[in-house]
């Protein structure tokens, strides 16, 4: 059924039934003829149609077995009240052509609802299309930014040309990650003191950096991360360990996840104790030391082979004398005023991962680094030597118990240091 598209508000739908055969012109004529003068001049159908307030009347009828049935559709631009009056007037029609007829209003539909439905549906289509275009545009922008960041900020560092952040050369503390994408992701959130090992084999550059910097090892939360931790602990000096959430990689972490992981990084001593790796690490250290000594011994033999075979009898005598001396040799007494004595003590504590508190020359107590802070809180002393990192918390506790000097293997992130306490790292003794 074709409906005038210019209708504005309502569609009056009336059902007609006649007891004889009629045609469309008969129906239209009956509508105009039998309602003329019924509703006054204001609602006269002819005038309303001329003024455009009533659209073209559409008639759909079908004749069967001597009866005619069908529908009449009248588009109305009138308001609800006027449209209802006009619809009621149609039901007064009792004859169409020569036949008796009955007219019944089935509905008065608000066509604006249909319009709104079409508007909503079309708006959804347009929004979806706009969203797809916007998404591709935003993805393009993100990719461009990533490329620019990578191009301008990632540098190649060391003889192995390792991917690193621009602050790697000047930072006292560094973050060691696995690959280039990890460095890029941290750069994206403003973390610039990073360097990548590019695999599980630790490069010489990273080993050398670990000797003079505070090192945080930041690895993926998978088996690959475990392997990198083990490798780094064997050949480099790691201070803290941070891990991505289980099953995730550093390169895919959000800013919030990165900050949380770095905030709750674990001191290496605590990590070793928690994971039962202390004995394993000692075994690695012993093996590495032995290999180094053997390598140095071989180099010495190659440099002076002629002296090794000279006067074997004299060598035996010397060895015998040295053996006698070794039996009588004792550990030198600790002297807090001697840098050599302090360095010797610090080396011992580093190897055993312990902390020792002194009052003058006397030892007040020696404890594992992992739980030493809680142990010394109730003690008193004037000198503290730790085989671990001098942290802000350790410094605060030491100051509170009267310590005047702290010696440690490394100095961590100290933001507040009292003027009357001395803080010294291994390489400054």
Swiss-Prot record:
Binding positions for Mg(2+) 2 per the UniProt entry: 220, 222
Bound cofactor: record note: Binds two Mg(2+) per subunit.
Catalytic reaction annotation: ssDNA + n NTP = ssDNA/pppN(pN)n-1 hybrid + (n-1) diphosphate
Record keywords: DNA replication, DNA-directed RNA polymerase, Exosome, Magnesium, Metal-binding, Nucleotidyltransferase, Primosome, Transcription, Transferase
Region of interest (Disordered), ranges: 287-322
Cofactor(s) it depends on: Mg(2+)
Protein EC: 2.7.7.101
InterPro entries: DnaG_primase, Primase_DnaG_arc, TOPRIM_DnaG/twinkle, TOPRIM_dom
Identification of the protein by name: DNA primase DnaG
Record keyword Chloroplast present: no
Domain Toprim: 172-246
Functional description taken from the UniProt entry: RNA polymerase that catalyzes the synthesis of short RNA molecules used as primers for DNA polymerase during DNA replication. Also part of the exosome, which is a complex involved in RNA degradation. Acts as a poly(A)-binding protein that enhances the interaction between heteromeric, adenine-rich transcripts and the exosome.
Gene3D superfamilies xref list: 3.40.1360.10
One term under GO cellular component: primosome complex
Pfam family, one: Toprim_4
Residues reported to bind Mg(2+) 1: 178, 220
Signal peptide: none
HAMAP family per UniProt: DNA_primase_DnaG_arc
Subunit structure: Forms a ternary complex with MCM helicase and DNA. Component of the archaeal exosome complex.
Homology family: Belongs to the archaeal DnaG primase family.
Chaperone keyword on record: no
GO molecular function, a single term: DNA-directed RNA polymerase activity
Gene Ontology biological process terms in this record: DNA replication, synthesis of primer
CDD domains with a match to the protein in the record: TOPRIM_primases (cd01029)
């Amino acid at each position: 059924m074709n409906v005038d598209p210019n209708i504005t508000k309502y569609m009056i739908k009336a059902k007609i039934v006649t007891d004889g055969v009629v045609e469309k012109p008969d129906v239209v004529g009956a509508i105009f003829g039998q309602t003329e003068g019924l509703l006054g001049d204001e609602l006269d159908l002819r005038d309303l149609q001329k003024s455009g307030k009533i659209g073209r009347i559409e008639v759909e009828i079908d004749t069967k077995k001597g009866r005619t049935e069908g529908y009449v559709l009248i588009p109305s631009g009138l308001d609800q009240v006027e449209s209802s009056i006009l619809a009621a007037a149609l039901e007064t029609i009792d004859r169409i052509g020569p036949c008796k007829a009955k007219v019944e209003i089935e509905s008065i539909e608000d066509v604006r609802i249909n319009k709104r439905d079409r508007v909503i549906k079309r708006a959804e289509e347009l929004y979806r299309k706009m969203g797809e275009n916007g998404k591709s545009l935003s993805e393009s922008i993100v990719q461009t930014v990533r490329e620019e960041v990578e191009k301008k900020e990632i540098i190649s560092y060391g003889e192995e040309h390792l991917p690193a952040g621009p602050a790697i050369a000047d930072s006292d503390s560094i973050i060691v990650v696995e690959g280039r994408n990890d460095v890029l992701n941290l750069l994206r959130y403003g973390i610039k003191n990073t360097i990548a090992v590019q695999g599980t084999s630790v490069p010489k550059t990273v080993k050398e950096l670990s000797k003079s910097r505070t090192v945080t090892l930041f690895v993926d939360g998978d088996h690959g991360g475990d392997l990198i931790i083990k490798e780094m602990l064997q050949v480099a000096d790691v201070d803290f360990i941070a891990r991505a959430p289980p099953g995730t990689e550093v390169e895919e972490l959000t800013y919030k996840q990165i900050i949380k992981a770095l905030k709750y990084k674990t001191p290496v001593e605590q990590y070793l104790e928690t994971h039962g790796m202390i004995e394993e690490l000692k075994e690695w250290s012993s093996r590495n030391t032995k290999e180094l000594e053997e390598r140095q011994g071989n180099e010495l033999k190659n440099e002076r082979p002629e002296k090794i075979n000279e006067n074997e009898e004299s060598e035996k005598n010397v060895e015998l004398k040295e053996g006698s001396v070794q039996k009588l040799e004792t550990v030198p007494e600790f002297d807090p005023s001697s840098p050599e004595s302090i360095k010797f003590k610090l080396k011992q504590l580093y190897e055993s991962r312990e902390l020792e508190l002194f009052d003058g020359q006397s030892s007040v107590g020696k404890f594992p680094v992992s739980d030493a802070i809680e142990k010394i809180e109730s003690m008193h002393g004037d000198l503290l030597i730790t085989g671990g990192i001098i942290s802000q918390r350790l410094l605060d506790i030491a100051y509170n118990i009267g310590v005047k000097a702290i010696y440690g293997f490394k100095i961590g992130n100290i933001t507040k240091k009292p003027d009357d306490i001395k803080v010294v790292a291994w390489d400054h003794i």
